[in-house]
Structure formats: C-alpha cells, structure tokens
C-alpha cells in the first residue's frame, strides 16, 4: 500500500519525511486528483465550513514571531487595544451568525492568558455558545489548569499553530519553543477540546520544511480537527516584510498534501486569501480545502469581504456548512439513553455519562 492509498483509507500517525516529500513531488494533476478522491471519501465536496475570527485583544504581544504585526518588538503602526468588553464581542458574534458563520473564533495577542482576564474569557465562551455557535479561541500558551477551565466553560476548539517545521522554527520564533506549542496542544486534548493547529507557508522555508510541518501535524496522537494553512501576509515593519512570494502552485500542493495526510480534518484556507484570485481559491477547494475565515479582517490583516466570498461560493456551487443542531455531547447522551431504553435486559447497558454506584470517582 503506497502513501496515497494509505492516506485515503486510514488515519495514519507514522508518516516519514520521504513519504511526504513523495506526495509533494507528484505531478500536479495527479496530486489534486488524489486529494479530491480522499476529500470525497470523508466530506461533501461542495460544502465549506465558515468561521469568523475576531481580535479580542490587539497588539503589544511580547513574543518575537517574525511574521506577526502584533509583536511589541516591531514598528508596524498597529495600535494596541485592551481586552474587548464581553458585550462588544457578543455583538460581533451575532453579526457573524447573521452573515452565515457557524463558528466564532476569538484571538488575543498574549504570550499566555493572565488570571485577571480568565473570568471575562470564560464568560465570552458561555455567551457565544448561548447564541448557538461553535466557539474557538487562540490565547497563546496554556497551562493544564487553564485548558481545563476553558473546556469546562464549553470551548469547542482551541487554536495553537505549530507554524512551521521543527527545523525551521528557530529562524522564525525564539521566545517559545516547539515543545511549548506541543505541550499546549496536549493540555487542550486533555481538557476534552478539539484542536485547531496548522502553520504558515511562504516565510522563506524550504520545501522540506513544508513537508516537515505537515508531518508534525499528522503524526500528533490525534489529528487536529481543523488545520489552517496560511500564506504569509507581509506586513511593513516585520522582519518578513520583503520576503519573496511563494509559488501559488506550491501553496495549492500544500493544501492537497494536508488533505491526503489528514483525511478527516477540516483543512482551512486561511490568511493570505485576500491576495489570491478566484481561480487560485477554486483550485484550493479542489485540492481539499473545506473551511475559510469569513469577514473583511483576520485579527489585523485583510481578508476578502463577505459579499465576494458568497458570490464565489455561488459561482462554484459551494454551500456554507451548517452547525449540527445539537452538540456532540447531547447527541451522545441521547443515543445512550435510547440504547438503554430498547435493551433487554436493561442491565446489559448503562449510561457512561453518569457515575455508577460504588464506582471510583476520578
């Protein structure tokens, strides 16, 4: 069984660099055909999940990520803002839902959340979920306790990107380690949340680094449920402002290989989309991208406006995905209840969500 066939039929966590590089080296049409075949085996090919991203705390970040205009180390003209008030966040969430978004993502330019801000963060999660939307946050590094509190508040997804390969990482960021990022992802998993993790291409990395990034993501104990693939947005004042553009076909290849390696994950066409023409975006959807950020801004960088996105969707026959009417936990509880009701004898089944008499509590 070759790498492509294995990727189409199984979730693998043992990819080698040689296998990933072999996928990247496929003729372009063959690669897209393989990616689309895998995509159709796991998803409706004409449905795209739509998220809205809001910066709830902007700028003055102490980290030194060379691509980021929110770093306090670079002079980008970005005005720092304090944590947004909860009601203002809810106003934006209501607008996002009305415009067709099923998930609301909230990002804060922090190294890690401070204790004084946690009550407001937790309330944002609870209130946005109350609107019937999925929730996602990106707040920097987390402790195990912080992850547990976010999970208990009902956070659906936590975003924490690996950014690039372990080998190239030190050329881009020095203020936190690759292992720091992996630790945060482990805490998120341990708290029962879904993982959103991807990276940025076009930062001057080599082809083997794009392969290494996808290998690091696919070889996690569980694949991220959402894998954002970002094209570098070059911002004046950052160290990467004059970086050469990545070949568009190489970006599309990265989308396709991500789809093959992580067949059941949503692959998000993320930052940099504002610079892509409609034909390139359509090819990304053909390559297996099935999620986008919707709205005129991603944190602090431009994004196509809502009308142009919906017009493109209409021309391509693409539908925005709808959120499941009931959360996974509710569906699971109802299924268990139905199984228990129909079982004979009833003692053969029990509701795993309820403690059993005499059972030890964890």
Swiss-Prot record:
Residues 320-339 are annotated as: Disordered. It comes from Aeromonas hydrophila subsp. hydrophila (strain ATCC 7966 / DSM 30187 / BCRC 13018 / CCUG 14551 / JCM 1027 / KCTC 2358 / NCIMB 9240 / NCTC 8049). Catalyzes the conversion of dethiobiotin (DTB) to biotin by the insertion of a sulfur atom into dethiobiotin via a radical-based mechanism. Its cofactor is [4Fe-4S] cluster; [2Fe-2S] cluster. Residues 46-273 form the Radical SAM core domain. One of its GO terms (biological process) is biotin biosynthetic process. Homodimer. It holds the Pfam family BATS. It catalyses: (4R,5S)-dethiobiotin + (sulfur carrier)-SH + 2 reduced [2Fe-2S]-[ferredoxin] + 2 S-adenosyl-L-methionine = (sulfur carrier)-H + biotin + 2 5'-deoxyadenosine + 2 L-methionine + 2 oxidized [2Fe-2S]-[ferredoxin]. The gene is bioB. InterPro entries: Aldolase_TIM, BATS_dom, Biotin_synth/BioAB, Biotin_synthase, Elp3/MiaA/NifB-like_rSAM, rSAM. CDD domains: Radical_SAM (cd01335). The keyword Iron applies. It is an enzyme of class 2 (transferase). [2Fe-2S] cluster binds at residues 105, 136, 196, 268. Its EC number is 2.8.1.6. One of its GO terms (molecular function) is 2 iron, 2 sulfur cluster binding. Belongs to the radical SAM superfamily. Biotin synthase family. Coiled coil: none annotated. Keywords: 2Fe-2S, 4Fe-4S, Biotin biosynthesis, Iron, Iron-sulfur, Metal-binding, S-adenosyl-L-methionine, Transferase. PROSITE patterns: RADICAL_SAM. This is Biotin synthase. [4Fe-4S] cluster binds at residues 61, 65, 68. Pathway: Cofactor biosynthesis; biotin biosynthesis; biotin from 7,8-diaminononanoate: step 2/2.
